[in-house]
Structure formats: C-alpha cells, structure tokens
UniProtKB/Swiss-Prot annotation:
Its EC number is 4.1.3.40. GO terms for biological process: pyruvate biosynthetic process; ubiquinone biosynthetic process. The keyword Metal-binding does not apply. GO terms for molecular function: chorismate lyase activity. Substrate binds at residues 36, 78, 116, 157. Pfam families: Chor_lyase. It comes from Pectobacterium carotovorum subsp. carotovorum (strain PC1). This is Chorismate pyruvate-lyase. Keywords: Cytoplasm, Lyase, Pyruvate, Ubiquinone biosynthesis. InterPro entries: Chorismate--pyruvate_lyase, Chorismate_lyase_/UTRA_dom_sf. It catalyses: chorismate = 4-hydroxybenzoate + pyruvate. Pathway: Cofactor biosynthesis; ubiquinone biosynthesis. Belongs to the UbiC family.
Length: 177
C-alpha cells in the first residue's frame, strides 16, 4: 500500500485555502488544529499504526515537498497507515530535516509504531505554520508545516476511503457523504 499511496501523494492538487466546494463536514476534518490522532480515536475502539517506511532520504527524493522545508543534506522520512478497528483510515507521511533532529532531539526517529500525534502534541514548543488542503482521485488530504522549538517538519495526511472523514452520523448509523 505504501508505494501506491506515496505515488498518489505526488499527484495531489494543493490549495492554499480550502476550496469553496468542500463539504463542511470534510472541511472541519481537514482544518483540525488539534491532534488528528485524538480525533480519530473518538471513532474507534482501537487505533493502530503500521510503519510502512522509515529512514533518511536525500533532498532529491522529495520532489516539490522540499520547497516546504529549509534545505538540508538529508531528511528523515516516515510513512505510516493509521487503522481504526483494523480499517485503513489515514496514510501519513512525515519529512523531518536533519537540522530539526539536531535542534530538538532525535526522538522523532524512534517513535516506531506509535502515532506521531501522541508525541507532537505533548511538546509545549509545537506550533503550526499552515494547513494546505488537497484532493486526488476523490480522496482528501492535508499538509501542515509544524515546528518544534522553531525547527520545521512537514506532515502530509491522506484520508483513505474508509476514514470517518467521509461519513456523517445519521439516524440510521454512519452515512457516506
């Protein structure tokens, strides 16, 4: 799944501002400023993470994502799928410049199969520069540049088809939007 989704991420059309055609329910998810991990946990009994890819990559392998981060010799890349009750809900891709790891600590490289949000939102120095929304093949995504003690990282989240972002509660249970 990781390679297919990684390829899909490169084709996302990004918007600086959410498009006016965005359904309100989906826009609310995409513009979430708190922990997406905590929000997803409200919709399942168990949220799990499968680590798809992790390690250092060169700037050349990032493509246009490198424009969102300061130049560096190498970047830490982490790709995961978050599952809600064993259903794939979210593909996450985190890119961390080496200088961010040097400037804060290397804990970001040791998260393993824990959700990134659990670590990030425990940090008092966490700030968010922006949220860009995007869409590709009917799937919605968001991209945020976050900073830990002023050092940036890029987080891209693609909401997979079974994600609660595409459903809304109704009298008959959850309905597809």
């Amino acid at each position: 799944m990781s390679d297919d989704v990684s390829t899909l991420l490169r084709t996302i059309s990004w918007f600086a501002e959410p498009p006016s055609v965005l359904p309100e329910h989906i826009g609310d998810w995409l513009m979430e400023t708190s922990s997406m991990t905590q929000r997803l946990e409200k919709y399942c009994a168990q949220l799990t993470v499968t680590l798809c890819r992790e390690g250092f990559v060169s700037p050349q392998s990032l493509g246009e994502e490198s424009e969102q981060l300061p130049p560096d010799e190498r970047y830490w890349l982490r790709e995961v799928v978050l599952y809600g009750d064993e259903r794939p809900w979210l593909f996450g891709r985190t890119i961390v410049p080496q200088q961010t790891l040097d400037g804060t600590d290397s804990a970001l490289t040791k998260i393993g199969n824990q959700p990134l949000g659990r670590y990030l939102f425990e940090q008092k120095s966490l700030t968010r520069d922006y949220i860009h929304t995007g869409c590709c093949e009917g799937l919605w995504a968001r991209r945020s540049r976050l900073c830990l003690s002023g050092f940036p990282l890029l987080l891209t989240e693609l909401f997979l088809p079974e994600s609660p972002v595409y459903y809304t509660p109704s009298d008959e249970g959850w309905q597809v939007i």
